[in-house]
């Protein structure tokens, strides 16, 4: 899979590509990351890419032309604008994007984009209801979430029991040695060796954690915790 990232700050992505799972995926040939500085496509003096807002307003807006020209350089990709106004990114969307051979993520900066940029992308995505200085961190977040789903990047089945996978609930609590730490004990059922009981406990714990931390997830579901 190829992921293009349009950014005014390509240096942000250097360490990101050189560490952990992303570096391994690139080395094995499962993933290609192509960072494009869309300032290089500016026709303005001094490669200017922003200007004042029509109708008045604070800050500067990114101009449509350099972004459009940069997008034209990756014609076969599925193009995504990163902005707070977009649909909120989630695991379901990560699976959808992982089906594409090539995607392009457009990172904003300053006060945002000229609205006409939307005419040259396929979709607009947000990573949450908060404001960041630029789209670089959201681009890394989406890149990692999508890359993990590309065949060959992770061991088969290694992501299937994580939060938001399978039944869509949060992951169940997990423990390792020691069995007791400062009086805090690992649940006895996990030490029992009874896999049927362990499986049931994990389903109950997953549901309880989701009920406590993410009621919004349960609001979207109709089934009970032990149905299926």
From Swiss-Prot:
InterPro entries: Alpha/beta_knot_MTases, tRNA_m1G_MeTrfase_C_sf, tRNA_m1G_MeTrfase_TrmD, tRNA_m1G_MTases_N, tRNA_MeTrfase_TRMD/TRM10. Keywords: Cytoplasm, Methyltransferase, S-adenosyl-L-methionine, Transferase, tRNA processing. It comes from Metamycoplasma arthritidis (strain 158L3-1). This is tRNA (guanine-N(1)-)-methyltransferase. Specifically methylates guanosine-37 in various tRNAs. S-adenosyl-L-methionine binds at residues 108, 127-132. PANTHER family: TRNA (GUANINE-N(1)-)-METHYLTRANSFERASE (PTHR46417:SF1). Homodimer. It is found in: Cytoplasm. One of its GO terms (molecular function) is tRNA (guanine(37)-N1)-methyltransferase activity. It holds the Pfam family tRNA_m1G_MT. Gene3D superfamilies: 3.40.1280.10, tRNA(m1g37)methyltransferase, domain 2.
């Amino acid at each position: 899979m190829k992921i293009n990232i349009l950014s005014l700050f390509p240096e942000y992505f250097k360490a990101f590509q050189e560490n952990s799972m992303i570096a391994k995926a690139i080395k094995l040939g499962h993933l290609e990351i192509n960072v494009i500085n869309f300032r290089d496509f500016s026709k303005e003096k001094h490669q200017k890419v922003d200007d004042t807002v029509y109708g008045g307003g604070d800050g500067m807006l990114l101009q449509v032309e350099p972004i459009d020209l940069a997008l034209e350089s990756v014609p076969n990709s599925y193009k995504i604008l990163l902005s707070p106004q977009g649909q909120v990114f989630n695991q379901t969307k990560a699976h959808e994007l992982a089906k594409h051979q090539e995607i392009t993520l457009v990172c904003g900066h300053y006060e945002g984009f000229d609205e006409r940029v939307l005419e040259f992308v396929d979709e607009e995505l947000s990573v949450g209801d908060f404001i960041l200085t630029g789209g670089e961190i959201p681009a890394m977040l989406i890149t990692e979430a999508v890359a993990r789903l590309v065949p060959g990047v992770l061991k088969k089945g290694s992501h299937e029991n994580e939060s938001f996978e399978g039944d869509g609930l949060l992951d169940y609590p997990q423990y390792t040695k020691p069995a007791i730490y400062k009086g805090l004990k690992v649940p006895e059922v996990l030490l029992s060796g009874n896999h049927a009981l362990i499986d049931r406990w994990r389903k109950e714990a997953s549901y309880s954690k989701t009920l406590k931390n993410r009621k919004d997830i349960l609001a979207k579901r109709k089934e009970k915790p032990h149905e299926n």
